[in-house]
Regions:
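A generic short alpha-helical patch detector that favors 3-5-residue windows
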Residues: 20-21, 148
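Generic structural marker for isolated residues within well-ordered, non-membrane alpha-helices
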Residues: 11, 30, 51
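A short beta-strand-loop structural module common to alpha/beta enzyme folds
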Residues: 23-31
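N-terminal beta1-alpha1 ligand-phosphate binding loop
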Residues: 1-20
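Cofactor-binding loop segments of dinucleotide-utilizing enzymes, especially the Rossmann-like FAD-
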Residues: 7, 27, 109
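Anionic-ligand binding patches
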Residues: 2-3, 37-189
């Protein structure tokens, strides 16, 4: 049993798929990334702040927090705030390669373990009609980079190198290795 410090329905689905038991308590923090840090360090810092915020009121519980971003040409794409911003993000990814980074942090009390997973993707060229139709579904609005690989945006992905589940918001292979070190074994392996 642990606490998932995330409101992401995809993270909840992925952990449930593994048969893990957890409670959800969301962290209310400022998710602004520190521009003085590298992108990888900044996303890890945001993730650690989520774990610390929830852990402050649950010091004896194992906390799992995560944060996902998309990086294209050194530019960080978080969740779009408007449909116009979602369309701009998708245009910036069209026909290009990008990296999805998900940081996760396990914590209990003063002990922390943080990991950042990278998955590299390439989108095919997207037409304005496809972008408009996809944004009209509403799906992009709660996702970093304005797309969900597990939904209709799957048809945009021309190539993928790395953990597919990382793109959904939680790199399951890396996470379960860490969970094992914290005493939680999936499939009792």
């Amino acid at each position: 049993m642990f606490i998932l410090a995330s409101q992401s329905p995809r993270r909840r689905e992925l952990l449930s798929m593994l048969g893990l038991t957890f409670e959800i308590i969301t962290a209310d923090i400022d998710e602004t990334m520190d521009p003085a840090l590298s992108v990888e360090d900044a996303v890890a810092q945001v993730c650690k702040k989520k774990a610390q915020a929830v852990g402050a009121s649950h010091p004896d519980q194992l906390i799992v927090a995560a944060d996902t971003i998309v990086v294209v040409d050194g530019r960080v794409l978080g969740k779009p705030h408007t449909e116009t911003e979602a369309k701009e993000m998708l245009r910036s990814l069209s026909g290009r390669s990008h990296t999805v980074m998900t940081a996760f942090c396990l914590s209990r009390g003063d002990r922390f373990e943080t990991h950042v997973e990278h998955t590299h993707l390439r989108f095919r060229e997207l037409s304005d009609a496809e972008i408009n139709a996809y944004v009209a579904t509403g799906s992009p609005m709660d996702k970093a980079g304005a797309y969900g690989i597990q939904d209709q945006a799957a048809i945009f992905v021309e190539a993928l190198d790395g953990d597919y589940y990382n793109v959904m918001g939680l790199p399951l292979c890396a996470l379960t290795k860490c969970l094992r070190r914290w005493g939680i074994n999936v499939l009792n392996g």
